[in-house]
Amino acid sequence: METFDLESHLQDAYSRFPEAKHQPVIGLTANYEGIDATLRDRYYKQVIAAGGTPVIIPPVADAQVIVNTLEHLDGLILTGGGDYNPLWMGEEPSPRLHNINQERDAAELMITRLAFNRQIPMLGICRGIQTLAIALGGKVCQDIKQLVKHSQDADRTEPTHIVEIKKDSTLYNIYNKEKIFVNSFHHQAVSEPGNHLRTIAKSSDHIIEAVESSEYKQILGVQWHPEWLEEEGLKIFQWLVNQANNFYAAKQLHKRILTLDTHCDTPMFFPQGIKFDHRDSRILVDLHKMTDGHQDATTMVAYLPQPQIGESFSSKVAFDVKGPAQYADLIFDKIEEIVSKNRQYLSIARTPADLYSDKRNGRKSIMLGIENGLALEHDISNVKHFAQRGIVYITLCHNGDNDICDSARGCNTHNGVSSFGEKVIQEMNRLGIMVDLSHGGEKSFYDALDISQTPIVCSHSSSRALCDVPRNLTDDQMRALAAKGGVAHTTLYHGFLRKEGEADIMDAIAHLEHAIDVMGIDHVGLGTDFDGDGGIRGLADSSELINFTLQLLRRKYSEQDIVKIWGGNWLRVMTQVQNFKH
């Protein structure tokens, strides 16, 4: 019997602790009519039945409001409704266009793009699948040519046509069927999914009925209304709530652990006047993307291109400098300038302790490195100079032999590490600088292992067993590296992950897991090579790095192991190297 006693209604919460178990928070976009923001109850009731906590989002096209809303969401549902104004797609209106809803359009396109930036799981329903397409670069047909009735007169709970599903899809995994029966209430449909989505289901008249992410993200759009299809429809909501739960777990994990990328080349774009405090489309690493991807720290290197015989160094760089050392100094000056402009949010870290301090204080960290010992200009005193600038490693060479060692893409000038290179390694040991053999030739690698008194590292190197290119490490190299306590970090340069086809996040995971199989969990990590041609589908920039964590969680890696992969192993070696300083 209904009671009007408030205390009795609260008793369930008050009689336990915590008052409620965690449920992922699912935002649902509201419709708008007249002066009312509304939502049909079937949407939020299905969310509750699936184990989520629904929150209705009013149509407010204010980025500040939307961003603050998204901070509290674990998943997002883009609900059904009227037509989109075709001007959002650069099109003139068709005579068959129905009612548009200007209050919703901008607000929902903005929230979709901002949620996409943050990797928030999304489900688009009817108009919502069209929202996904428009926001992510696709197209919507203003009025479909119908061979099948797509706007039924039957009750909303009654399925009226068949949808054919691709087997390699999220939808097939949900239903384990190639055909399902759905309801239908639309005259528009996605005509082109765009680069970020792919078609996974069609009706018999070839209308796109469902799309999903083409980048292994948790995004699904359906043209029908599963909220009305009871148990059959509930399965889609359960999928979203499950993905939202996983996303929540990954976010919580990132709050507890330190995440460090050991190699990026963002300074290569400094001549273009990039803005690190903007979401800058020219670069893959900036404050916005690091925040969206829950990334704590990156290692920015001064990359020095290796001149060919007869070339001058100054002809290969954009800045007017006297030589490699001055160029590296200029890069570090510019990084320091970026940090000084963003001190509330950004810091230069020189030690593991600095990284942890920055995380506690809510700042992102940049560590400094040199990619190509050419920066030393054959002057051993420059090792000390750059140590004083705060670098944590030097990659001994790049693509081409230098005066330190032979490159993986060199011509065996020294048969490994040169006599000068041996002195450089010894001085790096003395000054607490990590010796990085990414790009090094195989003989150089083994020479450095023998010479160095501290473990060496490979900041961005993948597996030759999976992608047979000289730049990658053989299994024997990996075993030798691990035996000396070193680490090798899988890189996201597509040509080092696969020789044919397009590399993606699954290739990166395969290389990581091969390295774990060969070396053990204590010797692996991630060095993206972002802005140095690194970046693949699913891990295209810093905003997508939480997807790496999601893949590790799906594979049941423990928190302890994820800590190691996300930089713990690297920082163990850094501590050992810096403690050896004398």
List the predicted regions and their residue ranges.
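Alpha-helix-loop-beta-strand connector modules within alpha/beta enzyme cores
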Residues: H414-L431, A448-C458
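Glycine-centered short loops/turns at secondary-structure junctions
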Residues: G51, Q119-I120, G137, H294, ...
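N-terminal hydrophobic targeting/anchoring segments and the immediately downstream early-domain regions
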Residues: A249-T413, D468-H489, Y493-L526, F530-H582
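N-terminal beta1-alpha1 cap of cysteine-dependent amidohydrolase-like domains
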Residues: M1-I125, I134, C141, K145-I174, ...
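Distinct, well-ordered alpha-helical segments
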Residues: G138, A353-L355, D379-V383, D406, ...
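Proline-centered loop/turn at the N-terminus of a beta-strand
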Residues: P24-V25, T53, P121, K139, ...
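Glycine-enriched alpha-helix->loop->beta-strand junction motifs that scaffold or abut catalytic
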Residues: Y216, H294-Q295, I391-Y393, L431-I433, ...
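Histidine-centered catalytic micro-motifs
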Residues: S184-Q188, G221-P226, T259-T266, G440, ...
